[in-house]
Amino acid sequence: MADLTKLVDELSSLTVLEAAELAKLLEEKWGVSAAAAVAVAAAPAGAAAAAVEEQTEFTVVLAAAGEKKIEVIKEVRAITGLGLKEAKDLVEGAPKPVKEAVSKDEAEKLKAQLEKAGAKVELK
């Protein structure tokens, strides 16, 4: 049983690219296709798996600039490092992602910054 726990720990530490490579290697070794198995197995267990796994990467999406557009543009520039024109285009083109693949803590911090400036923000 300890070997299985160790294996689970090692598999959990794989990056997405490493997991994809592992899937390809197992498909070749066993002569199967993971796509068919996932489609059949994911239907009944999809909701349960989503409830168990907590999202680790978030995208901070600017839903609307609100009344204080200039303040929001300043915050977007500070967060992203974009130039004035690029930040203005992003704010005026809302809803748009401001920052992608960030941790939950960082996403919450960025959301608070943008909301303080007057923006409406979503985390996805």
Swiss-Prot record:
Q: Does the keyword Nucleotide-binding apply?
A: no
Q: Which InterPro entries match?
A: Ribosomal_bL12, Ribosomal_bL12_C, Ribosomal_bL12_C/ClpS-like, Ribosomal_bL12_oligo, Ribosomal_bL12_oligo_N_sf
One GO MF term attached to the UniProt entry: mRNA binding
One protein family per Pfam: Ribosomal_L12
Q: Which SUPFAM superfamilies match?
A: ClpS-like, Ribosomal protein L7/12, oligomerisation (N-terminal) domain
Q: Which GO terms describe its cellular component?
A: cytosolic large ribosomal subunit
Tell me which domain of life the UniProt entry assigns to the organism this sequence originates from. Bacteria
Which processes are annotated in GO (biological process)? translation
| Protein keywords | Ribonucleoprotein, Ribosomal protein
Which Gene3D superfamilies has this protein been placed in? 3.30.1390.10, Single helix bin (1.20.5.710)
* Keyword Ribosomal protein annotated: yes
Q: What does this protein do?
A: Forms part of the ribosomal stalk which helps the ribosome interact with GTP-bound translation factors. Is thus essential for accurate translation.
Family statement drawn from the similarity comment of this UniProt entry: Belongs to the bacterial ribosomal protein bL12 family.
Q: How does it assemble?
A: Homodimer. Part of the ribosomal stalk of the 50S ribosomal subunit. Forms a multimeric L10(L12)X complex, where L10 forms an elongated spine to which 2 to 4 L12 dimers bind in a sequential fashion. Binds GTP-bound translation factors.
Q: What is this protein called?
A: Large ribosomal subunit protein bL12
